[in-house]
Amino acid sequence: MPQLNPHPWFFIMLASWLTFSLIIQPKLLTFVTMNPPSNKPPIAPSTTPWTWPWT
């Protein structure tokens, strides 16, 4: 059964993952901007309760 022969398929999988990991991924990571860490403490939002007209 040819689909059980790993010779051509393993090389294709390995080549595609190496292409992705070494070429495409570093190019994509340059476009992703991370938020810089801030020293401000997290502030909880102040909310007011809603009064429902039927209660």
From Swiss-Prot:
One of its GO terms (cellular component) is mitochondrial membrane. It is a single-pass membrane protein. Its main location: mitochondrion. It is found in: Mitochondrion membrane. Keywords: ATP synthesis, CF(0), Hydrogen ion transport, Ion transport, Membrane, Mitochondrion, Transmembrane, Transmembrane helix, Transport. Signal peptide: none annotated. GO terms for molecular function: proton transmembrane transporter activity. The chain crosses the membrane at residues 10-32. One of its GO terms (biological process) is proton motive force-driven ATP synthesis. Component of the ATP synthase complex composed at least of ATP5F1A/subunit alpha, ATP5F1B/subunit beta, ATP5MC1/subunit c (homooctomer), MT-ATP6/subunit a, MT-ATP8/subunit 8, ATP5ME/subunit e, ATP5MF/subunit f, ATP5MG/subunit g, ATP5MK/subunit k, ATP5MJ/subunit j, ATP5F1C/subunit gamma, ATP5F1D/subunit delta, ATP5F1E/subunit epsilon, ATP5PF/subunit F6, ATP5PB/subunit b, ATP5PD/subunit d, ATP5PO/subunit OSCP. Belongs to the ATPase protein 8 family. Subunit 8, of the mitochondrial membrane ATP synthase complex (F(1)F(0) ATP synthase or Complex V) that produces ATP from ADP in the presence of a proton gradient across the membrane which is generated by electron transport complexes of the respiratory chain. ATP synthase complex consist of a soluble F(1) head domain - the catalytic core - and a membrane F(1) domain - the membrane proton channel. These two domains are linked by a central stalk rotating inside the F(1) region and a stationary peripheral stalk. This is ATP synthase F(0) complex subunit 8.
